[in-house]
Amino acid sequence: MSHVWSRTPVTREGRLGTAAQHPGRSDSLYLKRRNAIARLARGHRVGEPSPAVEYTEAEHATWRTVHGALAGAHRAYACREVLDAAEAAPIPADHVPQHAEVSERLKPLAGFEFTLAGGFVENRRFLGAMENGYFHAVQFVRHPLVPLYTPEPDVIHDVFGHGIHLASPRFAELYRLFGRTARRLETPEALDLLSRVYWFTLEFGVMTETGSRTGSRTGSRTGPGTGPGSGPGAAPPKAYGAALLSSYGELARLDRCEVRELDVHAVVATPYRVSGYQPVLFSARCLNHLTDSLAGFLADFDDDTGDRLDLRPVPGDRS
């Protein structure tokens, strides 16, 4: 698997050239297939069954490649709650699962189901659906030339990231918390602030756990690797965020990230970028710390939160 990753043209900033140069955005044949699958979401209502996709052998092969890479990476870099959830709802190794197959595994565990999306979903619909146990997930597969990184969510991201989360009742309750919060918001600005909290926790969160990881390295006291878990003998934070769990490359470089202790007030003031590796991560001390921090901050989160915290719109690089 290392030879595949070594050929992946990721820049120091985490981009695969410019966004337009990524094969997932420049290969016309791939885009035709990707867009045909995405169009299945047109007119789809939350909670309706997702139509079945007849995946090609090439798409199944991409799935197998990523599954083989992530299985070991999760054992080395993922937190215990993630590993336990993955055992509760095993991910098939040999084929891309249909949404119905995923939902059948998840619903008895924590009450969640996949509902169809064609790509990025606006905040109100995406976050709000979580209150009722629905997670918007896509069905297309990332480009086969870059199987270990994708600049947009694909079915691999949704299953290996959010699908694992939603097999855990504790993580699933955090999704519902975001859903309840989103439902009481009216302004796009407030929803955007809420999406930042979601992004840096359930998408890109890490947490400190005692013990060591196979193959992990200790972060330095300055520069990359600073923050919780840094210093000689300290265990680096472990990943729980869905975007990290579905990206082999980002898992392998956790010790090179700037890691800051989780402070939700700081998180909500931090813009994020959708494509490219994240330069800054926020680390909870444990799952209880994450849960308490989110519950406390979101309890009175409303449309005036930005004004109360004196937050100004910060342009985010979401390309």
Model-derived features: where do they sit?
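A contiguous, surface-oriented mixed alpha/beta subdomain in the mid-to-C-terminal portion of proteins
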Residues: L145-G211, G215, G223, G227-D292
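The feature captures two recurrent sequence modes
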Residues: M1-G163, P279-S319
